[in-house]
C-alpha cells in the first residue's frame, strides 16, 4: 500500500522478489493505494504490481487480492458517492485488471461498506444510525455474482465490515444461491481489539476467513 508514495517501483520490485523467494504468495492491494490517498498516486500500487507481473511473468505464482472502494467524497474516484452499483463496480474492476496487467482477480473485496457508518472510531462512541440512500447489499452481491460468472474474479470478500453487514451477505448467498463471502479483512492489532467483540465468533461459526 506504500508502493508509489513512500516506496519507489524499484523498491517494490525488490520486495516482491524477496517475498516470492520466501514463499509468500498471497498479495493484497487496493485500487486506492498508495497511501495516503490522493489523486496523483491513485492506483499506483496496482500499477507497480502489474509492471512486476509483466517483467517476471509470474502472475500464475501469486494469489492476488485487491479491493474496490466504497462510498467516498473523492471525486476523482468515479465521480465520488456510492460505488457498489453495477456500473461502478464493473468500471473499477476493469481498471484494476488493466493496472495489474491480468485478466482475473483471485479475491475481490469491498474495501468498506457503501452505507454510511462509523469506522475506526470516527464518530466517537458506539453505533450511530444514519438514514441515507445507498446501494442495497443484495444488488451489490448480484453484481459480484455476475463478475464471478464472467471469470474476472474467483472469490469475493469484505473489508472494514460489521457483523450485521457480513450477516446480510451470508443470508442472501444462502437464500439465493449466490457466491459466498470467503473472507473479511478488518483491523486487528494490539490497539484495536474490536474484532474480538462480535466478528471473531461470527467468522468461526460461519467459516469465513
List each language-model region with its residue ranges.
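Short acidic capping loops at alpha-helix termini that bridge into adjacent secondary structure
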Residues: 59-62, 103-107, 154-155, 179-182
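Active-site gating/metal-coordination segments in enzymes
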Residues: 73-109
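Active-site-proximal loop/turn and secondary-structure-junction residues that shape catalytic pockets
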Residues: 2, 31-33, 68-72, 109-114, ...
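Active-site mouth loops of central-metabolism enzymes
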Residues: 1-10, 75-90, 126-135
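N-terminal binding-site loop/beta-alpha segment at the start of enzyme catalytic domains
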Residues: 1-67, 87-90, 94, 103, ...
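Surface-exposed, active-site-proximal loop segments in enzymatic domains
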Residues: 36-40, 70-86, 116-126
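Beta/alpha (TIM)-barrel catalytic core signal, keyed to glycine-rich beta->alpha loops juxtaposed to Asp/Glu
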Residues: 10, 113-209
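Conserved beta-strand positions in the central sheet of alpha/beta enzyme cores
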Residues: 25-28, 106-109, 157, 185
